[in-house]
Each structure stands twice: as structure tokens, then as C-alpha cells.
Amino acid sequence: PLLHGGGHEFGLRSTTENISGVVGFAKAVQVAGNSDIRYMNKLRAKLIDGLLKIPNVTLNGSKGDERLCNNINVSFNDIEGEAIGGYLDAYGISSSTGSACSSNTLDVSHVLKAIGLSHEQINTSIRLSISKFNTKKEIDYVLEILPKIVEKLRKMTPIKL
């Protein structure tokens, strides 16, 4: 048995479910989740708009509500995503070149490949994630630092992909 006592649920669990508590908790999660999603959507829109002002940057995936509120993937022509990530890290900004579940492989992202990106576009992409704990000030910081990094790396890159 999971809980000892009465014979509910064929002896596996004692007691009666608190249905009103379950329904109330579900509603609280829904309300809290909706406000978090709206907040992250605003941060995401601000970040995307700022990123697209950087020359030769492409948003991977759709721009609107058809994407997750907490995830942005962009490609920077002629700059390896790993190089951008290294510089971002030096400024205290976390990014990745793929999902956490593919971090131990050198394979290109199957998701980016499935939406039609070339090998070069995939290798020049980075992923930025947002949470309900991020602030507008942090988004502004990324948008202040990242264009400088991109400009510096493009000057250092003699070969255009």
C-alpha cells in the first residue's frame, strides 16, 4: 500500500481525495502559468526584435505565438555559434548551440535540420532561453553586449561561409 489505513483503491491508498483542493490547485497553477507566459512572451518579443536589428541575423522558427515563450534560436551569418557562446559566457550570459539532451553529441540539431536549415546555418546558430525570473534589464544587457560580440567576431573571421 502507498498509505496504510482504509481499503480505498483496492487497498493501495487510504483516504478520500480532496477534490475541491485539487480543482483549486489546478486553477491556481493555470492563473499563475498564464501570467508567467504573458511576461515571458513580452521578454521574448523584445529580445527577438533586438536580435533582428543585428546585421545578417536570422530567427530560426516562427516569430509569433507558434513558438515556446522561453526559447529563441538565431543564426549569425559567418560566425560559429560556439564562438559567440564563448564570448557571451565571458560576459555572464548563458547560451547554447543546441538542446540539453544533445549536449554530448557533435551531431547537428535535428530540429533545425527539420525546419530546413543548412549545415552552415545550424553551425552559426545559438539558443537563448528565458524564464519568468529574467528581467527587462537582463534582456537590455544581452542586446547591448551581443552586437559588439558579433561585430568583433565578424572582423576576426576572414572566411565567409
Locations of the language-model features?
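Pyridoxal 5′-phosphate
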Residues: 1-161
